[in-house]
Amino acid sequence: MITLTDSAIAAIKFALSQTCEPADGLRIKVEAGGCSGFKYHLGLDSESRDGDAVIEAGGVKVYVDSASQPHVSGMTVDFTTGVDSAGFIFDNPNARENCACGKSFG
C-alpha cells in the first residue's frame, strides 16, 4: 500500500524516540483542504483503530484509516533535508495535481 524509503524510516524512528507520549508508529491521514483539494495529516500514534491498514517497514509502523487508504495506495514516502528545511515528501500516483508546497494534492 505505502512504501517508505530508508530516510523516511529513520525520520519516523527519530520522531518516536523524541516523543513524551506513548507512540509506536506514524499515522497518515488524508483530509479535505490545501490548495489542491486534499492534504496530508501526519502524527504519531500508539495503536491501530478499526479499519486501519497497518504497514510495517524497517521496524516502524504506519497507520492509515480506511477513508484515506484509496488516496495513498501505491504512494512512496521519503524524507529529505536541505540547508533551510527538512520534511516528508510524498510521491503519490493517485494525485492528479500537486500544489507548489508538495503537501496538497488533487
Curated annotation (Swiss-Prot):
NCBIfam families: iron-sulfur cluster assembly accessory protein
Protein origin, superkingdom: Bacteria
Cystine crosslinks: none
A molecular-function term among this protein's GO annotations: 2 iron, 2 sulfur cluster binding
Keywords: Plasmid
InterPro entries the record matches: FeS_biogenesis, FeS_cluster_insertion, FeS_cluster_insertion_CS, HesB-like_dom_sf
Annotated organism of origin: Sinorhizobium fredii (strain NBRC 101917 / NGR234)
Protein name: Uncharacterized protein y4vC
Alphabetical GO biological process terms: iron-sulfur cluster assembly
Record-linked Gene3D superfamilies: HesB-like domain
Family: Belongs to the HesB/IscA family.
